[in-house]
Curated annotation (Swiss-Prot):
Record-linked HAMAP family: ApaG
Lineage summary: Bacteria, Pseudomonadati, Pseudomonadota, Gammaproteobacteria, Pseudomonadales
InterPro entries found in the cross-reference section: ApaG_domain (IPR007474), ApaG_sf (IPR036767), Uncharacterised_ApaG (IPR023065)
Domain ApaG: 2-126
PROSITE patterns, per the entry: APAG
SUPFAM superfamilies, per database record: ApaG-like (SSF110069)
Organism field: Pseudomonas putida (strain W619)
PANTHER family: F-BOX ONLY PROTEIN 3 (PTHR14289), POLYMERASE DELTA-INTERACTING PROTEIN 2 (PTHR14289:SF16)
Protein name: Protein ApaG
Amino acid sequence: MSDPRYQIDVSVVTRYLKDQSDPESDRFAFAYTITVQNNGSIKAKLMSRHWLITNGDGEVEEVRGAGVIGQQPTIEPGQSHTYSSGAVISTRVGTMQGSYQMFAEDGKRFEADIAPFRLAVPGALH
């Protein structure tokens, strides 16, 4: 969305969870920490999420749900909300991308895009 009043920026840090993974069973677990920053001028509530999780074979899993980790945080202008969650994929490398559906204090609904980010076992990429 180009209206600067509704500017939500999303940053992601990922980590491979070796102790929760089982490569011989094609199970690769990852944790991710996401910061949702309200750089707009209007308070906004994160209502729901939409994820596309793609493994290294191109298989896509679509996930939709209310809020994030059981919460629907309201984020004031200049403030952020950080949370951690996880994903399990069947290949050593994959990607996630998606969006948050937001509801602004003025009644406007808008989407905050989550740019693609990589899930990768250390050393899996050269």
